[in-house]
Regions:
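Active-site-adjacent beta->alpha loops and helix N-cap segments on the catalytic face
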Residues: 15-27, 62-75, 168-170
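N-terminal active-site wall of soluble small-molecule enzyme domains
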Residues: 1-48
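Single conserved hydrophobic/aromatic residue that forms the stacking wall/gate
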Residues: 232-236, 240-243
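Catalytic cores of alpha/beta
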Residues: 43-52, 66-73, 90, 145-154, ...
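Hydrophobic, secondary-structure "cap" segments at the distal end of domains
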Residues: 62, 83, 89-149, 153-154, ...
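Conserved, mostly hydrophobic/aromatic
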Residues: 16, 49, 81, 161
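Extended, domain-scale alpha-helical bundle/helix-rich regions
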Residues: 144, 150, 158-191, 195
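Structural preference for beta-strand elements that scaffold enzyme active sites
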Residues: 11, 31-33, 56-58, 78-82, ...
Length: 244
């Protein structure tokens, strides 16, 4: 970490409490962001992390916007929350399926994504699914673009977009589109906020798993959050914009 620190590293995202303590001890002025893999779903755990030195909490994907709002109202700490990308079928940071199934730890950034594989589902020895719903553990990707005003007004300080194992085209386009609508909301407010269908189509074209979902932010959707039919859909962007 020393060469990165000396080069001006802004902050580190940490999941392991031992690493957290090590960084706080040896780099006391380094900002620590508590990773979503810490499964912070409420005020009390987040307060403890702040007392230990965390400057930002990356909330669990399983929190709804009301819970995030309560966190913002009761705790003076930066909040970062996911708005676009993959959802885990398990609680953030608590899935060990990849470790068991292939020795690749999700908390070390090496998840093999066994949840994206097709499975046969049995009830009392009888198979109850078929090839039309065989991806029983695979959630749709999150897209919170339509509810961005609600996300911002809940107290979220920073929007998190999935980037791991994604190419530069994906990162550039998704960031560009979200930047456009953050600026729109800040300039026009809620009444002037309107999402162009073409931008949703572009997000869908570049990467999606059958359809998008807003995740847990506005409700618990259960089966509606799952991409049961197809594993993944990828295509080239239908429109290219100049990213400045």
């Amino acid at each position: 970490l020393i060469p990165f620190y000396e080069a001006g590293l802004d902050a580190v995202i940490v999941q392991d409490m031992g690493v957290f303590n090590l960084i706080r001890k040896h780099f006391p002025d380094m900002d620590i962001h508590a990773s979503t893999q810490m499964t912070q779903t409420g005020v009390y755990g987040s307060r403890l992390l702040k007392e230990l030195g965390a400057t930002r909490i990356v909330t669990s994907r399983e929190m709804n916007l009301q819970e995030i709002k309560q966190l913002d109202e009761r705790l003076d700490v930066e909040i970062e929350s996911f708005v676009h990308g993959a959802l885990c079928y398990c609680y953030s940071g608590q899935c060990l399926l990849s470790s068991f199934n292939g020795g690749r730890s999700g908390n070390r950034g090496r998840c093999a994504q066994p949840c994206r594989m097709p499975y046969d589902v049995y009830d009392n020895g009888e198979k109850i699914n078929n090839r039309n719903n065989s991806y029983a553990l695979s959630p749709k990707d999150m897209c919170a673009l339509q509810i961005l005003p609600d996300v911002i007004e809940s107290g979220v300080y920073s929007l998190k977009i999935e980037g791991r194992m994604k190419n530069v085209t994906y990162a550039a386009m998704v960031t560009h589109i979200y930047r456009k609508y953050v600026d729109m909301y800040l300039e026009r407010g809620r009444k002037g906020f309107k999402v162009d269908k073409q931008d949703i189509d572009d997000l869908s074209d570049i990467y999606n798993r059958g359809a998008f979902t807003t995740g847990y932010y506005d409700s618990v959707k259960g089966k509606k959050m799952m991409s049961l039919l197809s594993l993944i859909h990828i295509s080239e962007p239908t429109r290219l914009d100049v990213i400045s």
